[in-house]
Amino acid sequence: MKKRVVTAGTFDILHPGHYEILKFAKSLGDELIVIVARDETVKKLKGRKPIIPEEQRREMVEALKPVDKAILGSLKNKLEPILELKPDIIVLGPDQTTFDEETLKKELAKYNLYPEIVRFRGYKKCPFHSSFDIVKEIIRRFCNKEIKI
């Protein structure tokens, strides 16, 4: 039986850190499904809308080699896609703080789901390993007039 792995994230301004977590997640199983956060959800969590619209982020993530399928998250219940997908493994990113591993296990157990939950510890092999760092660098260069519009 195929081992299904699920991970989730915003994936706004793709960078090597995103690719590394997806490669890691895929290495744990046979099928990788990625849940891409909805624009409205990102705004609630981060206080700002993503730069890239949700459907475009979903398409970009799905185009990446490790990913078998990318879907948009639920606007009602963040656990809904996980309950539908019934993964064997859930991979959490290093900066995902909505759930810690134990809380997520307890929540899913209420629905008789017992996936292995793995925390990806991060990727910092390049200077731009986060979308926020990329945005900060663009602003820095623009303010220093290194970028002309």
Curated annotation (Swiss-Prot):
Q: Which InterPro entries match?
A: Archaeal_FAD_synthase, Cyt_trans-like, FAD_synth_RibL, Rossmann-like_a/b/a_fold
Annotated consequence of substituting residue 143 to S: Nearly no change in activity with Mg(2+) but loss of activity with Co(2+) as cofactor
Q: Where on this chain does ATP bind? A: 10-11, 15-18, 95, 123
Q: Would the keyword Nucleus turn up in this protein's UniProt record?
A: no
What cofactor requirement does the entry state?
Co(2+)
State how the cofactor is bound.
Divalent metal cations. The best activity is observed with Co(2+), where the activity is 4 and 2.5 times greater than that with Mg(2+) and Mn(2+), respectively.
Q: What is its EC number?
A: 2.7.7.2
**Enzyme class at the top of the EC tree:** transferase
* Keywords from the named record: ATP-binding, FAD, Flavoprotein, FMN, Nucleotide-binding, Nucleotidyltransferase, Transferase
Instruction: Say if the entry is tagged with keyword ATP-binding.
Output: yes
Per its UniProt record, what HAMAP family does this chain match? FAD_synth_arch
Q: Which purpose does this protein serve, as stated in its record?
A: Catalyzes the transfer of the AMP portion of ATP to flavin mononucleotide (FMN) to produce flavin adenine dinucleotide (FAD) coenzyme. To a lesser extent, is also able to utilize other nucleotides such as CTP and GTP as substrates, producing the modified coenzymes, flavin cytosine dinucleotide (FCD) and flavin guanine dinucleotide (FGD), respectively. Does not catalyze the reverse reaction to produce FMN and ATP from FAD and PPi. Does not function as a glycerol-3-phosphate cytidylyltransferase, as previously annotated in the complete genome.
Entry-linked PANTHER family: FAD SYNTHASE
Q: What is this protein called?
A: FAD synthase
Q: Which organism is it from?
A: Methanocaldococcus jannaschii (strain ATCC 43067 / DSM 2661 / JAL-1 / JCM 10045 / NBRC 100440) (Methanococcus jannaschii)
Gene name on record?
ribL
